[in-house]
Amino acid sequence: MKILIVSDTHRRNENYFQVIEQLGKLDLVIHCGDTEGSEYAISEGAGCETLIVMGNNDFFSKLPREIETTIGKYKVWITHGHNYYVSMNNEIIKEEAVRRGVDIVFYGHSHRPTVEIEKDIIAVNPGSLSYPRQEGKRPSYVCLLYTS
């Protein structure tokens, strides 16, 4: 199963469509929020199932604030992250993920890619394809290959 995880595209979808083309056939796209109204284009461009949550810039959106689902044997929580102060650090969101009993949390908001693997939780922020903030400011995403 090939899964693309993105966040914070902020209606600038050119890099997203390039990544979709480069990766080829996908089984799932997860968007961790801040589409700014372009969720239809993101879903249609994916060519597969798409899970999108609302970010702090998705005003008037009918997107869900959070999604809990499963991928294979893993319980997954998808959130934008702004309600868990991820711009400061990742401790609160990781604590909440453990409290919820999930294995993996996907989140965005900070525009900085991070992957943290700890005993109780895997926390993944794909960064931003449109407005990266990490050193070097390269657009980022995560491609997850899952085999059962």
What are these regions (language model features)?
Residues 12-22, 78, 85-97:
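Pre-active-site segment of Zn-dependent metallo-hydrolases
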Residues 51-56, 60-92:
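Helix-adjacent hinge/juxtasegments
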Residues 10-14, 36-40, 57-62, 84-88, ...:
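Active-site environment of divalent metal-dependent phosphoester hydrolases
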Residues 146-147:
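Conserved small/polar residues in nucleotide/adenosyl-binding loops
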Residues 5-7, 28-33, 51-56, 78-80, ...:
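Active-site neighborhood of phospho(di)ester-bond hydrolases with catalytic His/Asp-centered motifs
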Residues 1-49, 58-65, 137-140:
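N-terminal active-site segment of His-dependent metallophosphoesterases
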Residues 51, 87-142:
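Conserved beta-sheet core of the metallophosphoesterase superfamily
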